Every structure is written in C-alpha cells, then in structure tokens.
Regions:
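Conserved small-residue-rich beta-alpha loop and adjacent elements
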Residues: 154-228
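Generic beta-strand/beta-sheet core signal
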Residues: 55-57, 118, 133, 144, ...
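Hydrophobic packing residues within well-ordered alpha-helices of enzyme cores
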Residues: 141, 214-217, 245, 266
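Conserved NAD(P)+-binding/catalytic subdomain of aldehyde/semialdehyde dehydrogenases
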Residues: 161, 169, 173-178, 223-284
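Glycine-rich loop-to-alpha-helix module at the N-terminal edge of alpha/beta enzyme cores
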Residues: 49, 55-152
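Hydrophobic face of amphipathic alpha-helices that form TPR/SEL1-like repeat modules
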Residues: 1-59, 63-64
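Secondary-structure transition/capping motifs at alpha-helix termini
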Residues: 90, 110, 147-152, 198, ...
C-alpha cells in the first residue's frame, strides 16, 4: 500500500538555494511572532485567562508567542474527548489510519523549513539541528504509518492440535503525551503518533517553554484531516495539570520524556489505582 520507508534527507546549507530558502522561512516565522494559540480539545478552540508566554532563549527579549494555559477542568475535558474520539478511531482500518499519517508527513515535509525555523527561534537550535529534529519527526510519522499496517496482521502462534488460535494487537484507549523542550517536534511526534497509528488517542501537554512548535504541529494534524479528539493540544503548567492527567482514572498510558525527577514521579503516581480505574496504567 505504501512505498518502502526511506529516511527523510537532510539539507546541505552550503548550497546557496538551501541557505536562501531557510532565510526566507526565518523571515516568514518572524512575521508571525506574538501570535496567540488556544487549547484545542476536539473541534473546540478554548481560550483561558492564563497565558503561557514563549520567548527565544537565545534572545529573551523576543516573544515568540503565547499559548492558553489549561487548568484541571480542561485536563478532565481533554481526557473525556480523547475517549469519545477513541470509539471511532480505534475501529478504523490500519490502512485508513496510515493514510492520515502519510498525509501529515507530507504536510510536514512541505513546511519543513518553516517548522525548522520555528525551532531555531523558539528552541534556539542551529539550522542543522533544527532541520534534523523536523526530519526525525517526519521519519516517525512515515515509519509508524507502515508499522500500523504490518502490526494489524495476526501474530503467529504455536499450533496446538485440535485448536484454532489467533493473536491480535488491539488499541487500549486514551493516553497522555508529555514531550521535552529540547526535541520539541521529533519526540512529540514519536510519542504521540505511535499510539495514534495503533488506534489510540492522545492528549499532548507540550513543554511550557516550547508550546508554539507544538501548536504548529497541531495545526498540521487538523489540516491532515484527523478526526477531532484523536490528538488534543493542552498547553499548561505541569504543576497545575500534570498530576490531573497522570492520575485520571481513564488515562490508559503516559508517554514521557524529561527529567529523572519528573519521570520517577509519573511512574510512582501511575502505579496508584484511582477510584473507578478499570486497568493498570502504563508509563513509558
């Protein structure tokens, strides 16, 4: 169904045309600085009183933009919306889910330098590192599209006389994705798209220092035609919504990359069974 997987190539910025194109992308991004981005839960864009201001760490006086700061109530709503979307998304074929992923990868590829420029400004990555992060994000999306189709097939089991046995992998529900600031697109995409490819749904709580790159990713998710609620964008302070998302009795899994301290906290809290919780959580 899909062409064989090939890694996204890197650009050679000693080529004048590539250098010029990246400078154009940087100029275009600078024209968008200061834009505000709302929480996205399903089809709804939600404004809040609290705002998270993002600044260029290499030039702290430069405001990159702002994102709405979600509270505990919105965290609850986002989990419920993810479960509503799971009912339909989990029933789609792996091929259909894969097509959504391939469309997303194509959109990311079309805006590769723009996304890289956002990383240069919001995360202070140099050109090579910024583009490498975006290329890795595209690789994750393309790779998981193909893996979704492969893993949808029955798994070989040991034959036993007199029995007919099959083993299948199935999606498990709604989860939470908490990516770091230093690889704000690649790790976000990898931790979010893997579960989504398998038929799960997610709530993405981006790092508070790089919420704008995550907002741009969310725009592409919407443009790619993903059903509302499959991926939800929930910027907010970890101290305010982190425990709510991790502790929620309907959170099935937590994908986290970050500090040892926070990782141990998530692992510990995920192990506690909450009232009304039906399954043990999985913290990765």
């Amino acid at each position: 169904m899909f062409q064989p997987f090939v890694n996204e190539p890197y650009s050679d910025f000693t080529v004048p045309a590539n250098e010029a194109a990246y400078r154009v992308a940087l100029a275009g991004v600078r024209e968008q600085l200061g834009t505000h981005y709302p929480v996205v839960i399903g089809e709804e864009s939600v404004e809040t009183k609290r705002r998270i201001e993002s600044v260029n760490p290499g030039r702290p006086s430069e405001v990159v933009g702002s994102a709405a700061g979600a509270d505990a109530e919105l965290a609850e709503r986002s989990i419920e919306m993810a479960w509503l979307a799971f009912a339909g998304w989990s029933q789609r074929s792996a091929e259909d889910r894969g097509r959504h992923l391939v469309k997303l990868a194509a959109l990311m590829r079309d805006r590769k330098y723009e996304l890289s420029a956002w990383e240069t400004i919001e995360a202070s990555k140099n050109w090579l590192e910024a583009e490498a992060d975006v290329a890795e994000a595209i690789d994750f999306v393309e790779y998981y599209a193909r893996q979704a189709v492969r893993l949808a097939q029955p798994i070989d089991v040991v034959a036993y006389p007199g029995e007919e046995n099959e083993s299948h992998l199935i999606p498990i529900g709604a989860g939470v994705v908490i990516p770091p600031w230093n690889f704000p697109l690649a790790i976000l995409a990898g931790m979010a798209i893997g579960p989504v490819a398998a038929g799960n749904t997610v709530v993405v709580k981006p790092a508070s220092t790089t919420p704008i790159i995550a907002a741009k990713f969310m725009e592409l998710v919407q443009a790619a035609g993903f059903p509302p609620g499959v991926i939800n964008y929930l910027p907010g302070a970890g101290s305010e919504i982190g425990d709510v998302l991790v502790d929620h009795p309907r959170t099935r899994f937590v994908n986290f990359t970050g500090s040892k301290e926070v990782g141990l906290r998530i692992a510990e809290r995920s192990a506690h069974v909450q009232p009304g919780q039906l399954w043990l959580k999985r913290a990765f």
